[in-house]
Amino acid sequence: MEAVLGPGPRICEGDCAVLKRDDVFKAVPVLRRRKIIFEKQWFYLDNAIGHTYGTTFEVTSGGNLQPKQEVEESTTETKEAGTDNRNIVDDGKSQKLTHDDIKALKDKGIKGQEIVQQLIENSTTFRDKTEFAQDKYIKKKKKKYEAVITIVKPSTRILSTMYYAREPGKINHLRYDTLAQMLTLGNIRAGNKMIVMETCAGLVLGAVMERMGGYGSIIQMYPGGGPVRAATSCFGFPKPFFDNLHEFPLSKVDSLLSGTFSTETLPSEPEDNVLVEEESNGLTDEKQISLQEIEEESTTETAMEINQTEEQDTMDINAEDVEFKENKEKENKDNVREKQRKQWERRKKLIETAALLTQKNADGLIVASKFHPTPLLLSLLEFVAPSRPFVVYCQYKEPLLECYTKLRERGGVINLKLSETWLRNYQVLPDRSHPKLTMSGGGGYLLSGITVVLDKGKSDSSHLQALKMEEPSSKRCKVQDLHC
């Protein structure tokens, strides 16, 4: 069976991997001789390169990683355990090993599993504990003394869990089950043309890219000077995934909808060449002038044989100055060309993205930002084709209620639904399965719906009716009296 399936993906240098220890995750790049600090342990990932993802390693002396050998626990051996813990007194004297003794064991190179066994043997109350209490004690000591980590491949589930546990504020407290609901309600699939507006460090964008698998196109709307893709880089997507990833600033959406969108005149490549030629001509002129000066100095040198050594030193210094000046001007010229090339490429991509948006045939819209969702959604829905889903995430319910009301007044959408996901973890163990005492207070709210063709006449009449409803009752009575 293994020969048919083959080994899984292997850890390569330059990959982005996720370190896992119990329920703690950390995303790190896989580089040689780079010190990694994780859960109060430091180590190097050199020995992990070449192993398959999902391998569990043990940190040895010198920060090296070694694959952990699986030890089969004997089930035939019966454990000696007490009936209850009523006779156990927590006086701090039950453990015979001191802190210095444990440190000495570590200095001798004894591994964590052996240290745990020593702690069990030197505990005076371990045999009196119940079987459940003994398992809990062993688990606690293993977590403290066993330096074991697992390297896993990044995915939407792992990265969303990591961000929600470590830095929930960076992803607007977007819980992993809520993100899964967004991908489902948005009908994310390969070949789609999606619009994504998010301020979750690129986590939602990476989840959409992973679901689409590199097929289709994604237009990322961003505020400010540029998009933030810190979490997207942790996925480790190949370069072809980014070929169909476009970006467009939110500040230009209104001008694009009104038809006044325009960019500055693009610098063409011939203009760059002309500029380079002018700079190169200037450099040749300066070279000729400097060479003439050197020739004049050489003639005076022959005339004045007494100061021959001093003139030679002066000529060498001038030649070095000219060479340094030429190199510096060449670097400046290269920097100018590179800057112009990047500006030209950026404007070219901006025009291509604007052309994609003006087609107004996007297959879906995902919004998960820290800004108020109503103006964002009303503007971006103009680029979505009819009969396509849209999903809006917000940490709070009130902004989505206002957005729900505005959409009902505007029209052009059906199947509007405001929902909240409820998540609770369970401990599943023999004879002690129960809900965990701690659970998440909330994972945010989702507003979803489907676009339809907007009836302009109906929307205008509903707008007038809304204005009438906003008029004071006294004013409406006066108008009716005048008509009478």
Locate each region found by the language model.
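Intrinsically disordered, low-complexity glycine/charged-rich regulatory or linker segments
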Residues: 1-170, 174, 180, 212-216, ...
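Acidic, Ser/Thr-rich peripheral helices and adjacent loops at domain boundaries
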Residues: 230-279, 337, 409-410
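Glycine-rich helix-loop-beta junction characteristic of Rossmann-like nucleotide cofactor-binding loops
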Residues: 184-189, 358
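A short SAM/SAH-binding and catalytic strip from SAM-dependent methyltransferases
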Residues: 362-375, 394
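A short acidic, Gly/Pro-enriched loop at the edge of an enzyme's catalytic core
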Residues: 252-260, 268-269, 273, 329-365
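Conserved class I S-adenosyl-L-methionine
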Residues: 189-202, 206-209, 215-225
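C-terminal substrate-binding/active-site "lid" region of AdoMet-derived donor-dependent transferases
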Residues: 2-6, 225-229, 377-448
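Short glycine-dipeptide loop
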Residues: 190-191, 214-215, 384-390
